[in-house]
Amino acid sequence: MATVDTILQGKYPAKAHARRVAEYLQAQCPGNPGVIYLESQKTRMIEDNDETMPFRQRRPFFYLSGCLLPEASLVYDVSADKLTLFIPAIDPEDVIWSGLPLSPSEAMELYDVDNVLTTPEVNATLASIASAHNGKAVAYAIQGRTSPETKFEGFQDANFTLLNGWIEQARVVKDAYEIALLRKANDISTKAHIAAIKAAKTATNEREIEGAFIATCIANGAREQSYHPIVACGENGATLHYPKNDAELTDPVTKQRKKNVLIDAGGEYRTYCADITRVIPLGGRFAQETRQIYQIVLQMQLECIAMLKDGVLWDDVHAHAHRVAIKGLLQLGILRGSEDELFEKRVSVAFFPHGLGHYLGMDTHDTGGNPNYGDKDKMFRYLRVRGHLPAGSVITVEPGIYFCRFIIEPYIKSPETSKYIDTDVLERYWSVGGVRIEDNVHVTKDGYENLTTAPKIMEEVESLAL
C-alpha cells in the first residue's frame, strides 16, 4: 500500500476532477458542447497599506487545477477533454521584488493539465474554442468570479449559475489523492495537538496553547490554519466557537487552575483541512466531573463512528448520539425521566445543541451537505449534513456535552421541560464548561477509516498532560 508521501509526490488529479464535474454538466445540459472557465483568487491589498492580504485560493479553481497561484485562469473544453491553465506573464517590476515567477514549462511539470499559457492569451483561446464548435458551445463560469476583461465572444451562451453547484457536488466524494492530503493535514495536526497538550502544563493563558499549536503546524508544513483555533479553558468551553483565546488558566477567585481546556484546531495542508477537537486536564488528571462527561462523549463518538458505512443516513447517526447522551446524563442524575420521553421532548438539545458533524475537504465545513437551518425540529436544525453518506466522503464526528447557562436556563425555566433537569446535580458541572471530541472519518463501502490519530483515550491524554 502506497504511503501518504508517495501518493503526494504525484500530481494533484485536476484532469480527473474536471471530468467528474463535466459528468454533472452533461447530465444536466446535454446537447451543446460545454466549456468550463474558472479564475483563481486575485492578489488583494490591505486597506491603507502596501502589504498584500493573506492569500486563500478559490476552491473551485484549485479543484480543477491544483494550482495555488493568484491571477491565474483555466479553461476546460469538455468535448475535446482538454484542460488549459493560464498563469501570469512575467512582470519585470515584480521580478525585482519577488523573483522570477513560474514559467509555462515549469507549470506543465507541476500540474495535471494539457497545456499552459499566460493570462493575456485567455480571450484568444476562448474565441478559438468557440469557433471550433461553430458558435454552438456554452461557456460555464461562476457569478462574480470572472474578470471584466474576460470575454465569451462567439459562444452561444454564457451561464453563471450552474457550475458552482456541480463542483460542490463533485467535491463530496474524495479520491485517493485527496484522502492522502486530508491524512497529511491530520498527521500534522496530531503533532500540533500533542504539542498543545505539553504546552498546557506550564501555560498561564489560553494564547500560549494556541501559539504552540500554530507553531507546530507551520514547522511541519501546514502554514495555514483550517479555521481560527479554539482554545477554551473552564466555562469558556461551553461556547461552541469561542473566539478569544486569551483567558487566564487560573481562576481569579479560587486561585486554582481551571479543570480543563478544550482545543478545537486543525492545520491546512495544500488547501485540505483537518478539524480535530480534544479536551485535556489542566491539572494532569481529569477532575471527577470532567471525567464523567468525557466518558459519555467518548461513548457517543465511538458508537457513532461504528455506524458509518456507505449509504448510512446521517440523521440516524446524529439521533443515536443524542440517545447515548441521554442515557449517560440520566446515569449521572443530571436528567430524570425515561430515555424515550427525554428524546421526544428534545431535552438533550440543551446539552448537545449542534450537529454531529459536517463534510470535510478543502473547506472545514465542506460542500454538499444540504443542511436545513429552517428545520422546525431543533434536534436537527444545525445538522450540517442531511441525507445518506456516500463512500469516499469524509465527515467529522464531533459529539459534545456543554454546560452553557444561556442555552440550559430556558429549559430549566420552562414548565414543559424543567421537571427533566435536576438543578442540584447540574450545579456541580457548570465548571466543566464543555467536552467535545472530534475526529475526521473517511466513509468506505463497508465501514470507515478514521484519519485522526490524536490521543483521546483518557489515560493517553493524562500521560501527556502530567
From Swiss-Prot:
InterPro entries hit by this protein: Aminopep_P_N, Creatin/AminoP/Spt16_N, Creatinase/aminopeptidase-like, Pept_M24, X-Pro_dipept-like
Species for this entry: Aspergillus terreus (strain NIH 2624 / FGSC A1156)
Reaction catalysis annotation: Release of any N-terminal amino acid, including proline, that is linked to proline, even from a dipeptide or tripeptide
Role this protein plays: Catalyzes the removal of a penultimate prolyl residue from the N-termini of peptides.
Listed EC numbers: 3.4.11.9
Annotated residues for binding of Mn(2+) 2: D264, D275, E438
Keywords: Aminopeptidase, Hydrolase, Manganese, Metal-binding, Metalloprotease, Protease
Top-level lineage group: Eukaryota
Cofactor: record remark: Binds 2 manganese ions per subunit.
List of residues binding Mn(2+) 1: D275, E398, E438
Entry similarity comment: Belongs to the peptidase M24B family.
Needed co-factor(s): Mn(2+)
Single GO term (MF): manganese ion binding
The protein's name in its UniProt record: Probable Xaa-Pro aminopeptidase pepP
Enzyme class, spelled out: hydrolase
GO biological-process terms attached to the record: proteolysis
Pfam families recorded: AMP_N (PF05195), Peptidase_M24 (PF00557)
